[in-house]
């Protein structure tokens, strides 16, 4: 059984709704790991996300919120793309469907083609194999304090449904790991 404690950064009013009604799936055609309910492995990443959301003009007057969840599924329903063999398996399963006739053109074109392709590939693979939780550590380059580029990663989880969330609670932004929210 796969069980993991994960974090979701959002706005306070949305956190209240989530705790009452459950999460809504993110369904944009450019989602990083396909459609799903998104979580970060690291609390600090979820806090950064929540604080960025608050700074958006459309969210003026809102407050950040941090949710901690325990997600779960059977081992064979969890797929970790950090494992190179799993990534190769996903690519080889999807690749035959990317060719349009004899012309060899990708089915998806346009400015967000690669993002849409990744989303579509993840959705296809999850559906094909009954995957309920998909994980990947997205790399990015960041300069350290003295200017050296360093590769860091941000692990994310896309969970199919609220049924895969077995515990949920709100934590205080900036609080300690096991601190409850002050609200």
Protein language model features and the residues they cover:
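Extracellular structured ligand-interaction cores
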Residues: 4, 34-36, 64-68
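Active-site and NAD+-binding cores of ADP-ribose-processing enzymes
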Residues: 9, 65-183
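A general structural signal for short secondary-structure junctions and capping/turn motifs
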Residues: 28-31, 57-60, 148-149, 158
